[in-house]
Structure formats: structure tokens, C-alpha cells
């Protein structure tokens, strides 16, 4: 990032107005790097081999996951953090928030 360039941080998510927060958060994550967003959309799986054997591509992938997970942890209230604090992947944290506040397809279908 260029020195002096400001970064717009998404609003703190407190469990309300999820649809608005989700759009802002996605744009924020993509502004960090498209691969940060991909860590949420596609997910990341920890390789079976030891860290020393991961190679550059796997190290980059874990770093994108870590950046995404850190971003999510940083923009939620303590109450929301409790819901996602035990996750190790950004996709898992995002899915928990999405299921909690948007619902699953089955939940949506049951509302009709």
C-alpha cells in the first residue's frame, strides 16, 4: 500500500444490518487483495504436510486466509467475536455469520 493512502475500514458489526455490513466487508476484503476475498469465498484447507514442506504457494494461501480471518475478527463486537473465535478459516467464520444473520436456504424456505 502506498504511504499516505487511507484505508476505509468497514463498520463494526454488532449483529444488526447484516446485509449492509456484508457488502461493505466484501469490498474491504477485495481492496486488501482479491485473494483475501477468495480465502472466504473458496476457502482454505490446511495442508497435511508439515509447515516446512508447504512451499511458496501454500504459504501464500495461508497468509491470505490469515489476513481475511484477522479482518473479520477486527470488525465485529465482542458478542459477535464469541461466535467465530474458535474458527481457523475465514470461510468458516464468514459462514457462521452468514448462517446466523441471513439464514440457510432451508431457513428461508421455511419462512414462506
Describe the predicted segments one by one:
Residues 1-112:
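N-terminal Lys/Arg-enriched interaction segments
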Amino acid at each position: 500500500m502506498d504511504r499516505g493512502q487511507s484505508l476505509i475500514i468497514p463498520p463494526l458489526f454488532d449483529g444488526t444490518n447484516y446485509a449492509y455490513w456484508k457488502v461493505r466487508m466484501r469490498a474491504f476484503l477485495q481492496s486488501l487483495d482479491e485473494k483475501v476475498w477468495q480465502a472466504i469465498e473458496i476457502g482454505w484447507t490446511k495442508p497435511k504436510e508439515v509447515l516446512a514442506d508447504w512451499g511458496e504457494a501454500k504459504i501464500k494461501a495461508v497468509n491470505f486466509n490469515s489476513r481475511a480471518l484477522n479482518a473479520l475478527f477486527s470488525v465485529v463486537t465482542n458478542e459477535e467475536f464469541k461466535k467465530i473465535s474458535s474458527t481457523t478459516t475465514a470461510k468458516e467464520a464468514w459462514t457462521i455469520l452468514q448462517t446466523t444473520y441471513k439464514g440457510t436456504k432451508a431457513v428461508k424456505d421455511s419462512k414462506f
